[in-house]
């Protein structure tokens, strides 16, 4: 597939963009190529039977024109004309969106593909640098995000075009490295005989890690959620503190591996709901030291900046950038683009 084959014709404005997660669906309306997207009210997915109902609700009472196109990001694989969400009951049906909402075109992308689309536009208060030097212009970028799962995507610059490359990087192997790890890893439950990064580095993985730390320290496991652990760590609970220190160090290891895989001299970006709650632990030395400990390339890794994303919803901004100027990006839409004539 050539870059020319991925060129998207301009969308018919206004374009509705949306980031649909397991709990909330967040939307904005892009009016033209120049103006920022108009933020629309977020909609709890559980409050609506389907995406069409949620879109009607977010537009209701808003002084905006009706959308003519839609670009939506969902958590999960985009295959076929019926796209079930990973963590919600909705099944997104693009042809039903076209028929029910009067749209000309609908494009459905992966959620971390949308995160990658946001990276070239993040700056200022949207991000906080954690070590490294200046990002190189036109160099590859990578985004990794511990949330419900562990999302990952690269953003490659080639032929004057940004190319988002989503994948299943969250399932790479995560084994023990330090003596401390070797005490704890035997207590982490296996999935299919292995421990993938997502089994530890996610909102669901954090209690799993805390339980392993507790058992290794001959303590009773007593945390049931990521929120419990962060609150306990803030109160000085030793198991919770050690859990978050290990979590930060392991996230640094995985982020460093991803950086090496695409030579991400444009920076590695940390997204996801979990990272915002454990930012103090990411700022400490363990995260950055693990990120850089990639012999024989430690010097190279020391130069690569890491950015903690503070933007409340970068995926929507990334989709809006793509909707405004699709020719800036090479996004493969085969099997993911539906039009009114289909």
Features from the language model and the residues they span:
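Short glycine-aspartate micro-motif
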Residues: 15-19, 69-71, 107, 133, ...
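Conserved phosphate-binding catalytic cores of ATP/NTP-utilizing and phosphoryl-transfer enzymes
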Residues: 2-10, 55, 108-141
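Short beta-strand-loop/turn "lid" adjacent to the catalytic site in phosphate-handling enzymes
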Residues: 62-108, 113, 117-126, 143, ...
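ATP-binding/phosphotransfer module of carbohydrate and carboxylate kinases, centering on a glycine-rich
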Residues: 1-61, 65, 183-342
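Glycine-rich phosphate-binding loop of actin/hexokinase-like ATP-binding domains
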Residues: 126-197, 279-280, 287-292, 296-301
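Active-site nucleophile and cofactor-binding loops and adjacent substrate-binding regions
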Residues: 44-45, 85-88, 107-114, 133-136, ...
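Short, glycine/charged-enriched secondary-structure capping and boundary segments
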Residues: 31-32, 85-87, 122-124, 157-160, ...
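Short, acidic Gly/Pro/Ser/Thr-rich loop/turn segments
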Residues: 25, 77-79, 149-153, 208, ...
């Amino acid at each position: 597939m050539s870059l020319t084959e991925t060129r998207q014709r301009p969308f018919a404005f206004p374009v509705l963009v949306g980031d649909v997660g397991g709990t909330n669906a967040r939307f904005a309306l892009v009016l033209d190529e120049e103006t920022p997207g108009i933020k629309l009210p977020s909609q709890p997915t559980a409050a609506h039977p389907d995406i069409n109902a949620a879109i009607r609700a977010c537009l209701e009472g808003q002084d905006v024109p009706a959308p003519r196109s839609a670009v939506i990001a969902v958590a999960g694989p985009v295959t076929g004309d019926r796209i079930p969400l990973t963590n919600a009951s909705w099944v997104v049906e693009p042809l039903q969106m076209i028929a029910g909402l009067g749209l000309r075109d609908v494009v459905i992308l992966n959620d971390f593909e949308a995160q990658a689309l946001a990276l070239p536009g993040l700056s200022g208060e949207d991000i906080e640098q954690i070590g490294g030097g200046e990002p190189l212009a036109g160099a590859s970028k990578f985004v990794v995000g511990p949330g419900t799962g562990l999302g990952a995507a690269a953003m490659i610059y080639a032929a004057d075009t940004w190319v988002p490359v989503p994948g299943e990087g969250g399932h790479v192997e995560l084994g023990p490295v330090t003596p401390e790890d070797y005490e704890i890893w035997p207590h982490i439950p296996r999935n299919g005989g292995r421990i993938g990064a997502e089994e530890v580095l996610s909102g669901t993985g954090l209690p799993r890690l805390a339980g392993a730390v507790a058992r290794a320290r001959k303590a009773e496991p007593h945390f049931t959620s990521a929120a419990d652990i962060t609150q306990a760590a803030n109160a000085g609970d030793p198991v919770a503190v050690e859990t978050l220190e290990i979590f930060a160090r392991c996230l640094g290891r995985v982020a460093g591996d991803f950086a090496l895989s695409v030579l991400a001299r444009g920076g590695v970006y940390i997204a996801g709901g979990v990272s915002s709650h454990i930012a103090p632990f990411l700022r400490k030395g363990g995260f950055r030291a693990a990120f850089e400990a990639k012999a024989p390339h430690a010097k190279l890794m020391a130069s690569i900046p890491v950015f903690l994303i503070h933007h409340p919803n970068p995926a929507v901004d990334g989709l809006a950038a793509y909707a405004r100027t699709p020719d800036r990006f090479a996004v493969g839409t085969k099997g993911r683009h539906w039009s009114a004539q289909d």
